[in-house]
């Protein structure tokens, strides 16, 4: 068995083997992926992975409460930071999305509860055999995109939403020929022990 064909070099291999497709229910990590997927628009995911640590540092560990308070000085600082994608619209979107994220979390109790409602709270287990079979968007990502945009989120088109769903384990899009497919299908959530409780 071989890993998914897009994971041929670092940092993609480590990301594929340790994170991609593992269900995420931690609000901060969901917010991180929301921002990173939006930053990736028009770029390769490899580019974003290589800048991920820089993003964490530049965006205060992806703490939405802090980012939501960013002002003009922070925007200027971020535009001058070569370690991230220095796109004014994407930076403004990250700040605006932090504010909207907090509003959604207040309404639903957690961002996790809101986001996972688009897949009825459990991962969709796909059984793709070829990368050509994996869709770029689905009815669920279309619905997520519409609702996120209605609430004021930016850089959340359906293709970005589907990438977010893949990254956070809302869908298991590892090919069935990849050993991670079976591993991920048995994982409950990122960071949770798989041991049974007595």
Language model features with spans:
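HhH-family (HhH-GPD) DNA N-glycosylase catalytic core used in base-excision repair
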Residues: 1-198
């Amino acid at each position: 068995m071989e890993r998914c064909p897009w994971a041929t070099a670092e940092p993609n291999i480590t990301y594929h083997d340790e994170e991609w497709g593992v269900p995420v229910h931690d609000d901060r990590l969901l917010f991180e992926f929301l921002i990173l997927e939006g930053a990736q628009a028009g770029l390769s995911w490899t580019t974003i992975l290589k800048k991920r640590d820089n993003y964490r540092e530049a965006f205060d560990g992806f703490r939405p409460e802090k980012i939501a308070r960013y002002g003009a000085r922070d925007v200027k600082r971020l535009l001058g930071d070569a370690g991230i994608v220095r796109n004014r619209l994407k930076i403004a979107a990250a700040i605006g999305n932090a504010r909207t994220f907090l509003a959604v979390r207040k309404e639903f109790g957690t961002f996790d509860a809101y986001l996972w409602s688009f897949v009825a709270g459990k991962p969709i287990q796909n059984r793709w055999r070829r990368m050509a079979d994996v869709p770029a968007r689905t009815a669920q990502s279309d619905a997520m995109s519409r609702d996120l945009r209605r609430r004021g989120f930016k850089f959340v088109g359906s293709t970005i939403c589907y990438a977010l769903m893949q990254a956070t384990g809302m869908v298991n899009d590892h090919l069935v020929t990849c050993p991670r497919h079976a591993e991920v299908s048995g994982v409950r959530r990122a960071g949770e022990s798989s041991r049974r409780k007595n």
